[in-house]
Curated annotation (Swiss-Prot):
SUPFAM superfamilies referenced in this protein's UniProt entry, alphabetically: Vng1086c-like
Signal sequence segment: none
Protein name per the record: UPF0058 protein MJ1205
PANTHER family: UPF0058 PROTEIN MJ1205
Family: Belongs to the UPF0058 family.
Top-level taxon: Archaea
Length: 103
């Protein structure tokens, strides 16, 4: 996907988050890890990889809430979380490589 498409998907997940928060009476602790990233769809200066990681993280949180309420299998949430962690490690690896190159 192109970065602009990822940003649109990210925004769609924000709308879904708001709907799920109302429907299932979620508190902000459910989305704490996502909120702490401080990467939102309007942050177009963020890298494509950062948006991808954020999308996977937000998707896995939404999937966990849905699986807790019997709407989808737990395996969906787990798969999204594992995929997100792989992307996070790749981002960290690239940042380390850039730091080592600059020093």
């Amino acid at each position: 996907m192109h970065k602009d498409e990822l940003i649109q998907l990210h925004q769609l997940l924000i709308y879904l988050r708001k709907y799920i928060e109302k429907k299932y009476n979620c508190d902000n602790n459910e989305f704490k890890e996502y909120d702490e990233l401080n990467i939102y769809p309007h942050h177009i200066h963020r890298t494509k990889a950062e948006h991808i990681y954020t999308i996977f993280l937000l998707s896995s949180i939404i999937a966990k809430i849905l699986s807790d309420n019997g709407k989808i299998p737990r395996s969906v949430s787990n798969l999204l979380r594992v995929s997100g962690e792989k992307i996070k490690k790749e981002i960290q690896r690239k940042r380390c490589k850039i730091k080592n190159t600059n020093t």
